[in-house]
From Swiss-Prot:
Enzyme Commission code: 1.17.1.8
Name of protein: 4-hydroxy-tetrahydrodipicolinate reductase
Residues annotated for NADP(+) binding in this entry: 37
Species annotation: Desulfovibrio desulfuricans (strain ATCC 27774 / DSM 6949 / MB)
Catalytic activities: (S)-2,3,4,5-tetrahydrodipicolinate + NAD(+) + H2O = (2S,4S)-4-hydroxy-2,3,4,5-tetrahydrodipicolinate + NADH + H(+); (S)-2,3,4,5-tetrahydrodipicolinate + NADP(+) + H2O = (2S,4S)-4-hydroxy-2,3,4,5-tetrahydrodipicolinate + NADPH + H(+)
Function: Catalyzes the conversion of 4-hydroxy-tetrahydrodipicolinate (HTPA) to tetrahydrodipicolinate.
Keyword Lipid biosynthesis in record: no
Transmembrane segments: none
Residue sites binding NAD(+) per the record: 9-14, 92-94, 116-119
Active site as annotated: 149 (proton donor/acceptor), 153 (proton donor)
Regions annotated as coiled coil: none
Keyword ATP-binding part of the UniProt annotation: no
Amino acid sequence: MSTAIIVVGANGRMGKTISHLAATESAFSLAGLVDSREHVESLAGASCPVGDSLAAVLPKAPGAVAIDFTAPSVSLQSARAVAASGHALVIGTTGFTDAEKDELHELAKKAPIFWASNMSIGVNVLCKILPELTRALGDAYDIEMVELHHNRKKDSPSGTALTLGECLAEARGWQLNDVRCSARDGIIGERPKAQIGIQAIRGGDVVGVHTVYFMGPGERIEVTHQAHSRDTFAQGALRAAAWLVGQKPGKLYGMRDMF
């Protein structure tokens, strides 16, 4: 039996990719499309229900799983809608504030909700590998990260960089917010040992590149993940949607739960 998918932000780059895969892969079916009022008219003629909010489409798609790659304010509206209806929701949006994340955790007690800053399998394998590497190398190695994205990305550092940074900080027994440095300028003195640098580069149409540097006495180790297309993230989101069908409300699920 195929998993029915509602795509929120259907006119966006990720939305279009997810819609195409959901409509063409036998394991999935397209059950609804959602976009803002100024863009929803372009969805006219679709073979599934269309609306300018997830709340408007959910009653027409019982049992469907919504996938939302939009903006924090829109994704929160989607989460509130499924909390009221009982549908499941996969969120790939980044840039949430701490207060918004807290609300997601509360809403996840009422409906199955899955959130990840990066849906690629490779990045989530890195989250398992990097802590082991960090502990093996020890405190003699400084940790820095550089992330590259296209010139239309709105948040910085990327959600993926922050997720990887949290994995690295936890391995050192730190809280990322206490040790993160995202800008250096002027006479700032020596680099503190308890620090993880995360620098962002924006330009062109780069899908996403994250490189972690371990710099120690006389040597440097570089670990890089490079996304070649958005299909990587779309496939991961669809995989999460299929997995979420069998889950119950109670916690905000993530990639670690699925793996």
